[in-house]
Amino acid sequence: MTKRPSFIRNWRDSEAPAAPPGAAEDFGFASELTEAAGLGNLRVAQLRIPPGLRAYPPLAMRDLEVFAFVLEGAPDLWADGYLHRLAVGDSVCLTAGTGIAHSLINNAQGDARVFVFSLAMRRGEKVAQPTDSSASEQLAKLGMLWADAPKRKRGPNSGKPGDASGRKRGRPDSVVHWREILTTEQSRYPDSDEDQGFNARMDNRARLSRIGVHVEVLQPGQRSSWPHAERDEEEFAYVVSGRLDAWNDGYITPVTEGDFTGWRGGTGITHVMINNSEADAVLLVGGERSRAVNQFWYPFHPSRNKEIGKTFWADHPVPRLGPHDGLPDALRARVPAVRRRSAVAANEAARFLGKRKTKKKK
């Protein structure tokens, strides 16, 4: 595309103080990425926590699942009164309803940057702040206090920056580095030979049911999926490292580290991420997981539309697609010239290029 789409934003363009004006405590900075990209069902933000600050007071959410991913620095996860040092590439997955109180505190020397993801907070959400009685009183006045939160044994740490008590050597089950669970086999669609990267499924490991999130490693010449659109669910892709082309309705936008692309459900915008560079690219890919029904449409794979049966989005909007066929350059070069005359023919032919015996996409 000649013009960068409004739903592609870099965290640097929307960063602002995390605390409201006049707040009693400085919580560093936040880039509200889903707000900038126009998504309403998800909350995705990048937090920048300077040394000696915390991202938020210790709290527990009744209904929200929370995912956090360390992009830079060495922040501490505060969980139920204990400190756990995190490193770049570590992720934290917290399921709903456990009552685990948590915070992110930067007790290190340099800035910490953390990617956080959950569903957007809904009316009726309940919150517990076990270390702050005045905050609990305020929550009660607002009708937001989670008064019957599970009682949990709390460690000695106060949850304030600079308090070094209660530091644990080991990691809780909620923390894992993405490389530890990265698949050793490439992902593919059923009955396809096209390799589409390695995945670390954080959501499956943590048994998350409301949000889906995984780390995806795309090698040169690979794409994250086939071009598609979703009827019901919002989704996003965030570039952790590397250079990619964001393909949207037949047009290409170069994206790099820190770029966020968010797609609203129902718009019919067909999309895929393509690695046409000479190095691996690492993505965070996520979205809603709680919809009972979701439907899809593949503009260049009519055979796939037939295969998915009731999940085919039959009355999808019909976009005016641009000239790009959605194929990585290296993959297109392997498609016979006679098949490259049509985007549909080229993509269907690419389905059967590659090696067999590889993990298939769901």
Question: What are the functions of these language-model segments?
Answer:
Residues 46-50, 60-79, 118-119, 215-220, ...:
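Short, conserved beta-strand element in jelly-roll/cupin
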Residues 355-362:
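Intrinsically disordered, low-complexity polybasic segments
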Residues 40, 80, 209, 247-249:
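Short strand-coil-strand connectors
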Residues 22, 26-28, 34, 38, ...:
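Polar/charged low-complexity regions in secreted precursors and cytosolic/nuclear IDRs
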